[in-house]
Amino acid sequence: MTGRPTLVAIDDELEFTKAIEQFFTTRGYQVHIALTGPSGLKLVEAHRPDAVLVDLKLPGMDGDELLQRLRRTHPQTPVIVITAYNDGGKTRDRLLALGAFAHFDKPLSSLRDLADTVKRALGKPAEQKK
């Protein structure tokens, strides 16, 4: 990977995607955001990101279908799922079995934990706790 790492964030909550964009941009990432599954797929095709952040509940295509398509078309690209849907771990287990790199519940308790997971996905060391 050369230059700035690139992320695509796909979530139907504009405020959430803008917060993700701002957080990662200030840390040297290039971030592209999409509010629907189909537009997210187009961004992945156009930008070939280093990692994808995706919600499960999306207009046009749910996160499960999106994850499965990404695994077929971009098997080396880590996909991190961030969702408000929490069922005691069943969803997490299913997503990991489908090939997700990691799973986070909304609301996120720490953007730093997400950043550390993205760095792990990209093969970089995580930030040191202060």
Descriptions of predicted regions:
Residues T17, P59, D87:
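The feature encodes the CheY-like receiver
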Residues H47-L53, L58:
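Active-site beta3 strand of CheY-like receiver
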Residues I82-T83:
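Hydrophobic/aromatic residues positioned on beta-strands within the core alpha/beta folds
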